């Protein structure tokens, strides 16, 4: 089975320069790619893609071949029966990454590869760059996290299946099949539009991005309509959506006698950027 990933996973624009490589760690094979510039937290806005940090594609070493190169050549080599595992570095259009998992002659087989992203620093929060929550102290490695996920795969998958089943059953009982499908879609959409980090004072921050609107971060009128999901499934994340707004007022950085609209433009949470205050709407939402 052939898997291929493009360096564009880690770029904002296709013309940006990138570098890819393959390596081995703890019995796993890694393919890694990122931009050459690595300007961390240098961009803010709506229709933008992250271009700092690194994308990873990972598989077990046994029965695996991997290579870095031009997409056409990689696919040609696969069709001809082999990847050039000596080619483990490449740049730009020669930086596509390919994995081949070989299972011989089989009818049904279960297998896995892993995709991951280490953004190094995720959010700028009132001038302080914050790491992703899983590495908030800077003492973890992406390789250790990948290895743990690989080893715990069966348990993690069982938990995912159990949660999927419960969500669909509860939502179906509340509103029928179509309602349940909407709830499943909303669950994925909402969670995917947030980033989990820890504030310097230890507060949990679950920061939204206002996608295809204006790119604001931690917008209060996004927090409010998504609240039912988090109040049901994880109230701590709901607190994480509110902590930053409270801090903004309590610190004196926000001086008006009502709630702010946002904390900035994603991923820079340094203060409201929205041009018009919404004192009634946002204060009501926070209450």
Give the residues covered by each predicted segment.
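Acidic/polar, glycine-enriched structural segments that form the non-catalytic walls/loops
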Residues: 2-218
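Aromatic-rich carbohydrate-recognition surfaces in CAZymes
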Residues: 105, 134-157, 215-287
């Amino acid at each position: 089975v052939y898997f291929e990933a493009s360096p564009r996973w880690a770029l904002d624009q296709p013309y940006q320069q990138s570098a890819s490589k393959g390596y081995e760690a703890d019995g796993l094979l890694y393919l890694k790619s990122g931009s050459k510039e690595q300007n961390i937290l240098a961009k803010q806005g709506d229709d933008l893609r992250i271009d700092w940090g690194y994308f990873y594609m990972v598989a077990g070493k046994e029965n695996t071949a991997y290579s870095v190169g031009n997409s056409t050549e990689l696919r040609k080599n696969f069709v001809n029966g082999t990847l050039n595992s000596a080619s483990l570095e490449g740049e730009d259009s020669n930086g596509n990454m390919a994995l081949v998992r070989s299972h011989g002659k089989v009818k049904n087989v279960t297998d896995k590869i892993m995709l991951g992203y280490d953004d190094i620093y995720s959010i700028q929060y009132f001038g302080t760059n914050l790491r992703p929550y899983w590495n908030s102290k800077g003492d973890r490695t992406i390789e250790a996290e990948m290895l743990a996920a690989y080893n715990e795969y069966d348990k993690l998958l069982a938990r995912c299946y159990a949660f999927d089943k419960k969500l669909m059953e509860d939502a179906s009982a509340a509103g029928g099949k179509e309602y349940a499908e909407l709830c499943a879609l909303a669950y994925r959409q909402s969670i995917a539009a947030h980033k989990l980090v820890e504030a310097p004072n230890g507060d949990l921050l679950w920061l939204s991005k206002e996608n295809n609107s204006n790119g604001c971060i931690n917008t209060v009128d996004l927090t409010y309509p998504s609240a039912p999901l988090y109040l049901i499934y994880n109230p701590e994340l709901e607190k994480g959506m509110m902590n930053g707004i409270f801090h903004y007022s309590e610190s004196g950085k926000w001086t008006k006698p009502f709630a702010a609209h946002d904390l900035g433009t994603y991923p820079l949470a340094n203060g409201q950027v929205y041009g018009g205050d919404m004192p009634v709407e946002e204060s009501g939402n926070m209450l």
